[in-house]
Amino acid sequence: MKKFLFLTVLGLVASFGVMAQDVKFSEGSFKFGKIEQNKPVTHVFTFTNNGAKPAVIEFATAECGCTTPEYSKEPVLKGKNSTIKVTYNAAALGTFSKRVTIKFACVNDPVILTIEGEVVAAKPTAKASK
């Protein structure tokens, strides 16, 4: 009886581990480096559905209004890829590190994506000669 219970619990734990790996991102963070103020930048994160069921993004939220995630509402079939486009508006000078939380219907824990960089003052433009 103890052996049966142990194997049952072990099987459940293993299945939760597999569930957490159903969606795999090619990268979890991206560094823009130095970017000019007031010039929005975008990075596209790619993921693969390794699960048996279609992966559906329930929501993607950024920690502030300066960062915007965009994604497809369509299910991603087994073995297929999809993307999440993250745009940062670069309005405030200085370093930044922003997180985007992605929740998939087929995965228990949300995925956290991070973008980082430094916003520097825009270079002055040369005035046209008159």
Predicted features and spans:
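Short strand-edge motifs at loop-to-beta-strand transitions and within beta-strands
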Residues: 30, 43, 80-86
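Long, low-complexity ectodomains and other extracytoplasmic segments of secretory-pathway proteins
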Residues: 19-40, 44-46, 107-130
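A short beta-strand micro-motif common to beta-rich folds, especially ectodomain repeats
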Residues: 95-106
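Asparagine-centered strand-capping/turn motif at beta-strand->loop junctions
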Residues: 47-51
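Surface-exposed binding patches on compact interaction domains or structured appendages
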Residues: 52-81
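Bacterial Sec-dependent N-terminal signal peptides
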Residues: 1-23
